[in-house]
Amino acid sequence: MNQAFICDAVRTPFGRYGGALSSVRTDDLGAIPLRALMQRNPKVDWQAITDVIYGCANQAGEDNRNVAHMASLLAGLPLEVPGATVNRLCGSGLDALGTSARAIRSGEAELMIAGGVESMS
């Protein structure tokens, strides 16, 4: 069985309820760490990403229903890179990480992006 490693980590910004980030859509918020990840790792072949998996429990309003894929497109990842959004309430981001690790360990994937994003305002 393959080993899975976390190669880099970027934190989404956070704020207070009704604060400066309250008007930022969840998919736009999710694109911020993806852009930073791409800038910090210029040698990565971004087309080699097997999948982008994001946890998001509150997919409502004008947010895109597949926050992971829309955030990846907004960040500039290739259209061909798929995305999946996991809803496991408070554990959504952790579930996305576990799903990605299992895909790598089982040989289904070689390079994944996993994370979580939420906007409660």
Residue ranges and their predicted role:
Residues 24, 56-110:
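Conserved catalytic cysteine-centered active-site region
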